[in-house]
Amino acid sequence: MAKHFRIGMIVPSSNTTMETEIPAMLQSRMKEIPEETFTFHSSRMRMMHVTKEELKKMDEESDRCAIELSDARCDVLAYACLVAIMCQGPGYHEKSEARLASLTAQNGGAAPVISSAGALIDGIRTLGAKKIALIAPYMKPLTNQVIEYITASGIEVTDSISLEIPDNLEVGRQDPMRLIEIVKNLDVSNADAVVLSACVQMPSLPAIQKVQDQLGLPVLSAATSTVYKILKSLNLKTYVPNAGSLLSGKY
């Protein structure tokens, strides 16, 4: 029997990749599992530059977004901005997810809420990885906050690369296939897994499987982790073709 799901996305206003990669993964899945279909519904929070100040101001708009998406009776809500959550201190994703879920319930459209920040932590743990190496587009101080957040979750970051791109639109214009070369400068010798993009706005999907095959290590991203958590929350098989180990259907 056919099943249809509405995916609600809470998106920074300048983010162009969340609404590209997440639908791409689930549409790719639909080709192989046609009886499970998805539509995508977004609400935006204002943000142009990836600074701690703008991110905190943007996060205040997430409540409105959750209520708007619950008006559409979405089956699950995904909060796209990893660094907006992580720059507010360890464990903030749990507070944010609980608050937003409560707002959807108060609005009569109760839905589970996941965040890319929480999803990445869960994705790393699901793979059984204790140590990771990562690539992020952020300026180094923000990358350091991401590393601190991940470390506080009990995961060691053995190496990182910061691309230092402050303009969020420019982050979204990056060629994902460049990551195949960039990752060669990442020390993965002590890592159990590699986070190819610790940012939902930095495109990486076309490179995930290629880099995983190249390194012989599990490779994930903020976006693949978000899709994994979306599928888990809907009690669906966690399978997307050619999207790395996390979405192989094994976990």
From Swiss-Prot:
Q: Where is the active site?
A: 81, 199
Write out the residues that bind substrate: 15, 81-83, 138, 168, 200-201
Q: Which residues carry this modification: S-(2-succinyl)cysteine?
A: 81
Reactions it catalyzes: maleate = fumarate
Q: Name one GO molecular function term.
A: maleate isomerase activity
State one Pfam family annotation: Amdase
Query: E.C. number, please?
Result: 5.2.1.1
Q: Which cysteines are joined by disulfide bonds?
A: none
Please list the GO biological process terms of this entry: protein homotetramerization
What additional remark is attached to this entry?
Reaction is initiated by nucleophilic attack of cysteine at the double bond, yielding a covalent succinylcysteine-like intermediate.
Quaternary form? Answer: Homodimer.
Relate the protein's function as given in its record: Catalyzes cis-trans isomerization of the C2-C3 double bond in maleate to yield fumarate.
Q: Which family does it belong to?
A: Belongs to the maleate isomerase family.
Protein name (database record): Maleate isomerase
